[in-house]
């Protein structure tokens, strides 16, 4: 396969943010992600029969796929969570920068087109494909929302807040300088969904 034309992107900018929302909660516990592994989440598979589809990988992976089209990592081995399916792919080494992949079927169709994930940091170990197979470095937010992450190396989030106004459904309403506190905790520190 050729080098992918589409790289991982952050969620699109939202010019008219609508309301504060609660982060999605996982109903199924995921297994921990092993070191030097990236977990690729897929919202839905392109075809109904997952046993005839696979994840074909190349570039900075431990074992690039071989023997087209049946050498892909089969989705029959995929696990499920509240987002959809996921497969874990071992990286070549700690300096891995780019994972290229596609979803194919045993007939040899490249169903999704070539995709790639640029590893934004050595700690990045997950990527998500939405229902149109667009790649994200972050679990896609609900339409019309934006997540603001705030990470402090000292872990002190007391009296740290965010002010938002303008095209939002519920602008900050406290008196200055008291904004909305960062109370939710996620993979990248504290966050607020707007």
PLM features: what roles do these ranges have?
Residues 2-32:
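Intrinsically disordered, low-complexity repeat and linker tracts
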Residues 4, 41-45, 58, 88-92, ...:
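A structural detector for beta-sheet-dominated domains
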Residues 11, 31, 115-142:
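Extracellular beta-sheet/turn segments enriched in Thr/Pro/Gly and aliphatic residues
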Residues 36-53, 144-160:
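Short, surface-exposed binding/anchoring microloops in extracellular/periplasmic proteins
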Residues 48-94, 106-114, 156-194:
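Aromatic-rich carbohydrate-binding modules that target alpha-glucans
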Residues 97-101:
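Exposed beta-strand face motif in extracellular beta-rich ectodomains
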